Amino acid sequence: MDYQKDIIVIDKLGVVPTDSEVEYLAHLLCLGGTCRYRFNERDFELHAGDLSIIRKRKLIEKTEPSDDFRCKIIYAKPGFIDLCTPQSNYGMKGSLALFLNPVMHLTPEQQIVCRRDFDLLERRIADTEHRFYRETLVNAMQAAILDFFDFHARIYGESDISTQNASIMNRFLKMLEAGTY
């Protein structure tokens, strides 16, 4: 696995097109301005401090950033995210909720944590000479994912989902994403 191609951190839209042959999940932190987009046939608007997590970027339409829009984006391949996702059934609840509403309005404290996660990932990606490169990159992404879970649980509440239900929901979500329904 070439980890430098599995995860990319950039600061502008359009570098990885939504119709790219290579699928990437997008984690976008809005740093300034606004950005409107249509996802899953619903309209959303990002403001400074908002985090948007999109699992299926091909469902994005009509992206309209303001002239002063600034952001940081983590693009990660699904296989890399699967590798880094902690063994928690919360991931399924979050995935389903993000499919319905991919925007989280972060508190100022959460924004600091999120920005720190993005910065750490960017530094880890660049540090290819680290003797434990793979492990540090996976660890940094896993920490970011746990923070994303925490943001989501604090904003929308936490509920228990059994392992069996999480597995069924995961398969159902993959069918929806693939258009086989």
Feature roles, as predicted:
Residues S52, K56-K62, I81-D82:
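Histidine-centered metal-chelating micro-motifs
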Residues R36-R38, I60-D67:
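Short beta-strand His + acidic residue motifs that chelate non-heme Fe in jelly-roll/DSBH
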Residues A26, V113-L120, A140, A144-D147:
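Amphipathic, well-ordered alpha-helical segments in soluble domains
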Residues L106, T128-T136, F148-Y181:
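Short, Lys/Arg-enriched, Trp-marked, Pro/Gly-tolerant hinge/linker segments that flank
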Residues M1-S52, R57:
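Generic protein-terminus/edge-of-domain signal
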Residues V15-V22, K62-P65, D160-I161:
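Short histidine-centered beta-strand/loop micro-motifs
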Residues P65-D127:
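A hydrophobic/aromatic-rich effector-binding and dimerization subdomain
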